């Protein structure tokens, strides 16, 4: 049967599949539009499965507030330009909206999708992989909800390269609505994005991290010819410096290095008439810790030619 160009165009607009695939789908289903959508979905899901072993190390970080709840996620793709795709951005918006309404316990991808209970959240990624043509994965997610004595703030840097979420507290509930506290949260979130602290205070840095650093510093000092009896004292000073450089409250404030972040908290506290604290924070940097795959170009071309 003859398939009209208009019907092919409508199917393409609905599914975002290629023109030839849409034509094949309509021919295979005798022009039944809904059956053609399902045919493409099945074909797309098959294509998505083939992409499962690819490495997704690009993408973007997204951070948003939904009322008093903040959500930060990292979604990975195979190439950086996909993060600018409208479909990719729409996927991120839907995922953030879903996570703001649910808990993060267990496998979040197995959760019934909040906007359509006939789907699981993971189905959105399978469909996006098929539609966009690259492996799309949810790598990590975090969610904070403010209390009567705290506020949550999110900050995005560099078009989704770094996302920060922070919860700051005030000792008096009435101080939470003071604009100065929100400004403090924004300033500290920006600082965290720039300076990448390990923890809020030295007490929160794991003992094994400090122990490992001591080992490295001791070995370096021995290697440089320092006297063994002096090394312990030298390393103690170096560890103090290490902690100061990696603890948020002890770091020089990025917008005014003459004061520490802890000094900024005290200053804002005086302004709003309440003790101000940083309760927790999370910082996602795109692709951090992912080993990117590097292919031999000649081998890649040879592999592609096998299919022709």
Curated annotation (Swiss-Prot):
One of its GO terms (cellular component) is cytoplasm. The keyword Protein biosynthesis applies. It is found in: Cytoplasm. Disulfide bonds: none annotated. One of its GO terms (molecular function) is translation elongation factor activity. InterPro entries: EF-Ts_dimer_sf (IPR036402), Transl_elong_EFTs/EF1B (IPR001816), Transl_elong_EFTs/EF1B_dimer (IPR014039), Transl_elong_Ts_CS (IPR018101), UBA-like_sf (IPR009060). Residues 79-82 are annotated as: Involved in Mg(2+) ion dislocation from EF-Tu. The keyword Cytoplasm applies. Belongs to the EF-Ts family. This is Elongation factor Ts. It comes from Bdellovibrio bacteriovorus (strain ATCC 15356 / DSM 50701 / NCIMB 9529 / HD100). The lineage of its organism: Bacteria, Pseudomonadati, Bdellovibrionota, Bdellovibrionia, Bdellovibrionales. The gene is tsf.
């Amino acid at each position: 049967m003859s398939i009209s160009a208009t019907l092919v165009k409508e199917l393409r607009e609905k599914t975002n599949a290629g023109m030839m695939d849409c034509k094949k789908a309509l021919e295979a289903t005798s022009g039944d539009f809904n059956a053609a959508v399902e045919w493409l979905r099945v074909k797309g899901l098959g294509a998505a499965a083939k992409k499962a072993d690819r490495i997704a190390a690009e993408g973007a970080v997204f951070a948003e507030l939904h009322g008093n709840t903040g959500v930060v996620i990292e979604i990975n793709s195979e190439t950086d330009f996909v993060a600018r795709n409208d479909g990719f951005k729409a996927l991120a918006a839907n995922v953030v909206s879903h996570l703001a309404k649910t808990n993060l316990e267990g496998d979040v991808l197995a959760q019934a999708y909040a906007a359509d209970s006939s789907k699981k959240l993971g189905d959105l990624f399978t469909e996006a992989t098929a539609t966009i043509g690259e492996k799309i994965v949810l790598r990590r997610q975090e969610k904070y909800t403010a209390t009567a004595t705290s506020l949550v703030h999110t900050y995005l840097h560099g078009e989704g390269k770094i996302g920060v979420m922070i919860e700051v507290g005030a000792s008096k509930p009435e101080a939470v609505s003071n604009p100065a506290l929100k400004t403090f949260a924004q300033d500290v979130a920006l600082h965290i994005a720039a300076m990448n602290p390990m923890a809020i205070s030295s007490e929160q840095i794991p003992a094994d991290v400090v122990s490992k650093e001591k080992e490295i510093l001791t070995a370096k000092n021995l290697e440089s010819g320092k006297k063994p009896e002096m090394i312990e004292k030298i390393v103690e000073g170096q560890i103090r410096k290490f902690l100061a450089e990696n603890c948020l409250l002890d770091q020089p404030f990025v917008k005014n290095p003459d004061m520490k972040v802890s000094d900024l908290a005290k200053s804002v506290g005086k302004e709003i008439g309440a003790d101000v604290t940083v309760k927790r924070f999370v910082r996602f940097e795109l692709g951090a810790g992912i080993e990117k795959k590097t292919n031999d170009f000649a081998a890649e071309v040879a592999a592609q030619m096998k299919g022709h």
